[in-house]
Each structure stands twice: as C-alpha cells, then as structure tokens.
Amino acid sequence: MEFTDLLPCTVVERVNRFLVNVKLNDKIVEAHLHDPGRLKEIIYTGNKVLVRRKSGKKTGYRITFGLREDQYILIDSGLHSQIASHFVSQECKPEVKIDDRRLDFACNDIFIEVKGCTLSIDGVAIFPDAPTLRGYEHLRLLERLAQEGKGAYVLFLIFSDATSFRPNSETDPRFSDEFYKALKNGVKFSFKRFSFDGKYLKYSGDILTFDGDDKS
C-alpha cells in the first residue's frame, strides 16, 4: 500500500481517546486518532507521527503512523479491512452481520475477523493493548461458528518486526482466556507482519510461533 500524502508532525497532547493535538509546521492543529488502543508507547508528548489531510472532517487531519523505536507503526485502524482484503478471496463480502455483531468478511460459510496489533515487547507481538469487550465477543462468536462446522478465522495484522505472538493476559485476561478457548475449539488464527519504509506499507511474512503457554 502506497502513501504519498503523509505530513510529519510532533505530538503535543492527547486530548481524549480519538483526538490529539499535534504540531505541524510550527502550528498546533487537531488530528483524529482512529485506533481504540491506548498506544502509550506511541502517542505521547514529543513523539513523531505522520498525518494525512482529511477534507470535510472536523479535525482536518488523521494520524496514520506513529514512531516507536525508530520504526513507524500504522495506527489507523480504518485501513485494516483494506489491507486485509489483499489476503482474502475477492468473493468475500465485507462487513457481514451475524446476530448483533459484525464480522469483517464472509465467504459462503467462512467468516473472518481482522485485528490490528501495534504493541510488541522484546520481539513478541501482544494484543490487545487495552481491554476489548468487542474483541472478546468476536472470539466467542467465531468459536460458536466453528463449533457449528463453519470456517472461523482471525487475521491479525502485525505492525512491527515481532517474531512471535501472545494474547495480553495482563491487560485483558478475559480476551486471553477466550483466545486459547477459541483456538482449542476450531478457530484458526493467522498473523501477517508488515513494515513501512516511509512510502510503502509492505507485507513481510507470517508469524508462525506463539510465545508462552498455549493453555491446551
């Protein structure tokens, strides 16, 4: 995926969950942050971010990448489905409603949910970085679909150079427990890693290993 309209900024203050004041060309402007995570290791005063201009929006700018350990990480979850669409069949339908939940893709009796992972520690990708009731409910739904004989998948987009993955049992033990339960009951997980070179977000291979106890 190519990005040609990125503007470098410096974080001034995170006003709330979705609004950040940034310094752009010596002027403080408001930028929308489209990511439900805490992002404490990325969104803090003085750190570098890359934004895109968004006409017709309240803030005018949208944060797309944030710097962490000399590497820019994608932090715009609004792009996740677009990225994931390169890895699913063109026959898949997006945003499919099942009961009172929505899943990102459905291909006949195969259902796929997409999650973006920005947090990594010592080469281990960790999700989530904040408690996620929505993520937990998605896993429960996919587990039920798997037990009904349908294909149930979670596609994790890993925006770091991590070499393994684990659910974040410290931050969200409920999600972590359900992750292993869903895995045991037929939900399939895929972990695709991406890197950014300043212009292109590139697929850089799959993570094939788990870190820690698989609770099997």
UniProtKB/Swiss-Prot annotation:
Looking up InterPro entries in the UniProt record yields: SfsA, SfsA_C, SfsA_N
Question: Which residue windows are transmembrane per the record?
Answer: none
Please name the Gene3D superfamilies in this protein's record: 2.40.50.580, 3.40.1350.60
Q: Which family does it belong to?
A: Belongs to the SfsA family.
Question: Where is coiled-coil annotated?
Answer: none
Organism, by scientific name, is Thermoplasma volcanium (strain ATCC 51530 / DSM 4299 / JCM 9571 / NBRC 15438 / GSS1)
Protein name from the UniProt record:
Sugar fermentation stimulation protein homolog
GO function term, MF aspect, one: DNA binding
One family name in Pfam for this protein: SfsA
